[in-house]
């Protein structure tokens, strides 16, 4: 298949770029799920739900956005791409509005699709205006206690640091509230002008981060069996969103000129080992 051939070629490049990757790193993997965004309109409800649970009380990290549901202004498929759009507007007629002056969308596969281990790839073009905070990430399907339940950030970008892509894991032992989070970064100079493949290879032994087939960070399971250090042996779901402001995204302020801000996504694909 075309995708399988492309994956093999990509992984060969990644293996060359990151010596710790074996050339046959994905032997035995096959595509198990994808969204190619071929049908215009709202995102496919068989694949994506809207996370709006904290609108009334306010979102984490002192963020400024209201996450809307079923609103094409904030999430839609057009021209073969998923568009997530953050806008400068107040939706105060909605019953769960919490006083926010920006709108956006937070799409999740929670309750629909989740995976334990695999190779994850999202092809995206991201916004770069000051105050924007786009993210492609994963949480435990049955998360009740963050960070104990774990978090995998496939891609994060803050608009005041243009082109610097972050890949991070959060656990009880390793997280930003303690200053112990484990992550890496890579500069992608045209991240806001061109599409790139943001990738994670997650196995029982390691979580590896890459962009366009080039690996740049690895978090390894130390084998201790301590879930505070490695909570990554259970199903996780995907999340796509643009946050506005917040402790990190708004560290240098929020410029109204940054909005509307779009993250455009050409595909989301998941491969898993079949043996």
Question: Model-found features: residue ranges?
Answer:
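Bacterial N-terminal signal peptides that target proteins for export
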Residues: 1-7
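Sec/Tat signal peptide C-region and signal peptidase I cleavage site
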Residues: 18-22
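Bacterial N-terminal signal peptides
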Residues: 8-17
């Amino acid at each position: 298949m075309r995708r399988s051939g492309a994956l093999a070629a990509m992984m060969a490049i990644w293996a060359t770029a990151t010596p710790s990757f074996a050339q046959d790193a994905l032997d035995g993997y096959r595509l198990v799920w994808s969204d190619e965004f071929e049908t215009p309109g709202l995102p496919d409800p068989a694949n994506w739900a809207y996370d709006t649970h904290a609108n009334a009380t306010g979102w984490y990290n002192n963020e400024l956005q209201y996450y809307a549901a079923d609103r094409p202004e904030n999430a839609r498929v057009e021209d073969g791409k998923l568009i997530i759009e953050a806008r400068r507007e107040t939706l105060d007629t909605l019953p769960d509005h919490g006083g926010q002056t920006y709108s956006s969308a937070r799409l999740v596969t929670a309750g629909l699709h989740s995976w334990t281990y695999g190779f994850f790839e999202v092809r995206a073009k991201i916004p770069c205006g000051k105050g924007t905070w786009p993210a492609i990430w994963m949480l435990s399907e049955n998360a009740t206690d963050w960070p104990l339940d774990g978090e995998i950030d496939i891609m994060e970008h803050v608009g005041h640091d243009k082109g610097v892509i972050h890949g991070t894991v959060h656990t009880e032992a390793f997280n930003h509230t303690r200053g112990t989070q484990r992550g890496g970064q890579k500069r992608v100079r045209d991240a806001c002008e061109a599409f790139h493949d943001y990738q994670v290879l997650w196995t029982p032994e390691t979580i590896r981060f890459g962009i366009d087939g080039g690996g740049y960070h690895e978090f390894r399971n130390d084998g201790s069996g301590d879930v505070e250090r490695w909570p990554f042996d259970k199903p996780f779901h995907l999340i796509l969103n643009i946050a506005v402001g917040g402790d990190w995204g708004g560290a240098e302020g929020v410029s109204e000129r940054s909005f509307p801000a779009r993250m455009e996504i050409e595909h989301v694909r998941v491969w898993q080992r079949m043996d």
